[in-house]
């Protein structure tokens, strides 16, 4: 791995693997992304949508997971052929500026203030899991909230990319097994589902009462705006851009052709990484939706405040026995903690880089970056803990964050269009299928943001 992956030099150039097995050895950024994606959105937003709408909105979840990948690929391509971070790219966008920063960075900072509620809800979700265990409940909610915040802060402050990648892979395996077992176990309960019910969820219907929850679920399931923005940092730290090397100053000749070949090769590796992540989080997200539709919707339950985890766990206990409750709690803990860990690692980098673009620090300098990331690793969990203890409504907090994520996607769309239309080398633009998928992603995201805005303003009920 490059000594400083955020700076491209000739010394770190590496030819991309050409075989499938060779490419598999270089996968990794998608692991961290999947660990971040599969968590609060699934345990809270996805199950809430299933509880309110039943199986009929299953297609919304699948669409949400599939449609945003083209934007993720565009951001990833940009990182590989330029070596620039997300915030460096935003700061170079055309449009108005405020001080040293592009307006998009300031808007992102404003929207992210609402996202603090979302991750505060995740911290609370982890604390509530500990509170479900009689032997641990005596410590109290405040203690477990602070404990959760401290543990994740310590891990992120000392963990580097390789450690985060391995830990994410372990958690992905655990929560995938957990969700599969949970859904399969349903078939031995009164809440068993049928193939006809699954097919009814692919009928492209959307009840009016479920519109705002569907919008929130769209923002928070699948790859979200903040996760697309964070993906570049994991690609850079894995070394994809460093292995591609700096782009020659001229656009023709042997050196440029060699660079193009390397860039295409590492973009193919990145595409495989993104597709593998998509398969993983789509599968787990669909399974969580089925849990919400089959258990909560059938029983007329729409969990509020701190009841989500306990209601799901109680129904499993009634159907399968006391042993099921412990397994459910363990799985829920892994799911939520994976999101918490990955989100903090990403936020620490995104905010440090954003502050650097505004003139506060130097993200490109390894020592300055390490200090800034370490500081954010402790400050952010403290804020999340305070917010949860103030509101104590993890489900609502996560949904609010999901709506905020839908607006962050607008920034992502604008930046991705500029990358695709103006910045990408002509030879790396992609084929017609990719261009069509990119257009569909952009239109869908803008449409959801418009619906969300109209709902918030009371223009639609």
Protein language model features and the residues they cover:
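Extracellular/periplasmic helix-exit of transmembrane alpha-helices
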Residues: 70-81, 236, 242-243, 279-310
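Loop-to-transmembrane helix boundary motifs in multi-pass membrane proteins
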Residues: 138-147, 323, 327, 355-390, ...
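Flexible loop linkers connecting adjacent transmembrane helices
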Residues: 6-11, 46-48, 73-99, 130-134, ...
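Juxtamembrane transmembrane-helix boundary signature
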Residues: 33, 61-94, 107-118, 342
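C-terminal membrane-solvent junction of multi-pass transporters and transport-like membrane proteins
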Residues: 170, 349, 353, 359, ...
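Hydrophobic alpha-helical segments and their helix-loop junctions in multi-pass secondary transporters
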Residues: 173-233, 413-425, 448-460
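Membrane-interface "cap" regions at the ends of multi-pass membrane proteins
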Residues: 1-43, 216, 243-245, 262-271, ...
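Hydrophobic transmembrane alpha-helices that form the core helical bundles
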Residues: 101-136, 336-354, 394, 446
């Amino acid at each position: 791995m490059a000594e400083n992956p955020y700076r491209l030099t000739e010394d770190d150039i590496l030819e991309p693997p050409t075989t499938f097995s060779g490419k598999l050895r270089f996968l990794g950024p998608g692991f961290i992304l999947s660990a971040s994606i599969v968590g609060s959105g699934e345990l809270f937003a996805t199950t809430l949508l299933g509880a309110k709408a039943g199986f009929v909105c299953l297609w919304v979840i699948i669409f949400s997971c599939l449609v945003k990948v083209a934007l993720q690929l565009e951001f990833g391509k940009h990182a590989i052929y330029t070596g620039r971070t997300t915030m460096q790219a935003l700061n170079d966008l055309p449009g108005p500026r405020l001080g040293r920063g592009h307006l998009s960075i300031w808007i992102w900072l404003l929207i992210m203030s609402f996202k603090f509620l979302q991750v505060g809800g995740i911290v609370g979700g982890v604390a509530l899991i500990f509170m479900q265990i009689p032997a641990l409940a005596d410590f109290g909610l405040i203690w477990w909230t602070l404990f959760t915040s401290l543990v994740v802060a310590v891990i992120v402050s000392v963990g580097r990319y390789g450690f985060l990648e391995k830990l994410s892979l372990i958690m992905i395996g655990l929560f995938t097994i957990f969700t599969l077992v949970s859904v399969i176990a349903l078939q031995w309960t009164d809440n068993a589902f049928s193939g006809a019910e699954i097919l009814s969820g692919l009928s492209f219907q959307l009840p009016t009462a479920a519109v705002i929850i569907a919008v929130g679920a769209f923002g928070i399931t699948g790859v979200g705006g903040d996760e697309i923005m964070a993906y570049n940092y994991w690609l850079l730290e894995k070394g994809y851009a460093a292995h591609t090397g700096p782009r020659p100053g001229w656009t023709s000749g042997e050196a440029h052709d060699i660079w193009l070949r390397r860039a295409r090769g590492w973009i193919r590796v990145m595409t495989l990484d993104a597709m593998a992540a998509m398969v993983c989080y789509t599968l787990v997200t669909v399974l969580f939706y089925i849990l919400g539709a089959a258990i909560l919707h059938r029983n007329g339950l729409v969990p509020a405040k701190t009841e989500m985890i306990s209601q799901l766990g109680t129904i499993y206990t009634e159907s399968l026995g006391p042993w099921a409750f412990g397994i459910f709690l363990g799985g829920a803990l892994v799911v939520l903690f994976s999101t918490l860990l990955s989100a903090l690692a990403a936020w620490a980098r995104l905010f440090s880089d954003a502050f650097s673009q505004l003139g506060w620090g130097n993200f490109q300098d390894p020592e300055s970056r390490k200090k800034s990331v370490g500081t954010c690793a402790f400050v952010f969990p403290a804020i999340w803990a305070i917010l949860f203890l103030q509101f104590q409504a993890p489900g609502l907090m996560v949904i609010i964050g999901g709506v905020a994520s839908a607006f962050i996607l607008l920034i992502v769309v604008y930046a991705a269009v500029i990358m695709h239309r103006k910045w990408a080398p002509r030879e790396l633009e992609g084929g017609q299928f990719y261009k069509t998928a990119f257009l569909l992603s952009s239109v869908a995201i803008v449409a959801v943001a418009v619906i969300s805005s109209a709902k918030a303003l009371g223009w639609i009920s």
